[in-house]
Amino acid sequence: MAKNKDDIKYATAQAKLSEDEAIRVSYKHGTPLEGGKIAESEPVELFSSAQRIEKGKEQSAASGDQTQIQRDIKDIKGTRTDDSPR
């Protein structure tokens, strides 16, 4: 651990030789890097719920004009549940 400000090195990666491997593995913030990527990483789908949204849109389009009719009813004064002015 650093004792003073001079001991801190910013934006530097350290390399060490792994005992069980004959390859160099570099570490950045304690995470091992191999070939510029995080070691043994798997692809992660960040927006997995986006597929469900797209499927929902397709299903609503297949149901016809029923959703448009429901929207029109909500626009009639007095039929909205919150009765807030538009």
Swiss-Prot record:
Where in the sequence does UniProt note compositional bias of the Basic and acidic residues kind?
71-86
Entry keyword annotation includes Chaperone: yes
- GO biological process entries: maintenance of seed dormancy; response to heat; seed dormancy process
Domain of life of the organism encoding this protein: Eukaryota
- Where is the segment annotated Disordered? 52-86
Q: What is this protein called?
A: SEED MATURATION PROTEIN 1
What protein family does this chain belong to?
Belongs to the LEA type 3 family.
Sample GO molecular function, one term = protein folding chaperone
- Keywords, ordered alphabetically: Chaperone, Developmental protein, Stress response
Phenotype of the disrupted gene, per the record: Increased seed germination rate after high temperature fluctuation due to a reduced seed dormancy; fail to enter secondary dormancy after 3 days at 40 degrees Celsius.
Q: Report biased composition (Polar residues) as residue ranges.
A: 60-70
Leader sequence segment: none
The miscellaneous remark of the record is: Boiling-stable protein.
- Which purpose does this protein serve, as stated in its record? Protein chaperone involved in seed maturation and dormancy maintenance after high temperature fluctuation (e.g. secondary dormancy after 3 days at 40 degrees Celsius), probably by protecting heat labile proteins required for secondary dormancy (e.g. G6PDH, HOP3, SR45, ECP63, SCL33, RPL32B, ChlADR1, MSBP1, MBF1B, At3g01690, At1g15280, At1g15290, At2g31410, At1g11630, At1g65090, EMB2279, EMB1674 and RPL35C).
Looking at the keywords, is Chaperone present?
yes
